């Protein structure tokens, strides 16, 4: 068993408390976290939260897959980039950051879902932000990446065909590339099924 949390500004305190309580009940179960609230200053976060075993830094798609494989095979964590973890003796190891995947290589995680009747789907056609707002974590890395429009169209059509009631775009700066945003909106307009609402 392993317990894994995604940490954001709105849930980080709950995750800290829950991890500490869970660790009291099941100290043998590793607890891992990831997300924007824990990807920076990982050594400090681990020292302040002794119940947490490790942190996935940055984007988690490839890291989580490798981490789960490591747990299944009971292999060393030392070959996994993008993690920070506590060894059995308490020392903290910080592995090198993982390079960002091209957007088209990120998995489409909805293909195997069947029942969409009461679901809200969160979808990203891009990641990153070109701006430098001092209060926002997005300003740390100004890389802006896009899924190719043909791939986005195929994925949107999947939602339309499945009659998903609500699809929410979670792109940080959806309209910063005009042709990308307009391509998506035109596709949605031309393929409207009268059921799927895109937000």
Give the location of each predicted region.
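Flexible, glycine-rich phosphate/dinucleotide-binding loops
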Residues: 40, 92, 101, 142, ...
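Surface-exposed loop/turn and secondary-structure junction residues enriched for glycine/proline
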Residues: 41-43, 48, 80, 86, ...
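A generic structural signal for short, non-catalytic loop/turn and secondary-structure boundary residues
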Residues: 76-78, 99, 116, 193
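Glycine-rich beta-alpha loop elements in corrinoid/cobalamin-binding modules
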Residues: 2-97
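Short, surface-exposed acidic/glycine-rich loop or hinge patches that mediate macromolecular interfaces
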Residues: 8-9, 36, 100, 128, ...
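A short, sequence-level motif marking secondary-structure junctions
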Residues: 97-103
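Radical SAM [4Fe-4S] cluster-binding motif and immediate context
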Residues: 104-199
């Amino acid at each position: 068993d392993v317990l894994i949390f995604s940490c954001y500004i709105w849930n980080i305190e709950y995750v800290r408390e829950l991890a500490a309580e869970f660790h009291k009940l099941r100290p043998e179960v590793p607890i891992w976290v990831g997300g924007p609230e824990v990807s920076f200053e990982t050594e400090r976060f681990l020292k302040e939260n002794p119940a947490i075993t490790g942190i996935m830094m940055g984007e988690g798609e490839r890291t989580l897959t490798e981490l789960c494989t490591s747990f299944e095979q009971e292999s060393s964590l030392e070959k996994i980039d993008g993690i920070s973890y506590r060894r059995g003796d308490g020392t903290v190891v910080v592995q090198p950051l993982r390079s960002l995947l091209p957007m088209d290589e990120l998995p489409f995680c909805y293909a195997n879902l069947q029942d969409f009747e009461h679901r809200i789907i969160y979808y990203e056609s891009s990641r990153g932000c070109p701006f430098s707002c001092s209060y926002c974590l997005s300003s740390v890395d100004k890389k802006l990446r896009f899924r190719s429009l043909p791939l986005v169209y195929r994925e949107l059509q999947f939602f339309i065909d499945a009659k998903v009631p609500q699809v929410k775009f979670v792109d940080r700066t959806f309209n910063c590339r005009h042709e990308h945003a307009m391509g998506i909106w035109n596709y949605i307009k031309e393929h409207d099924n009268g059921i799927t609402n895109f937000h």
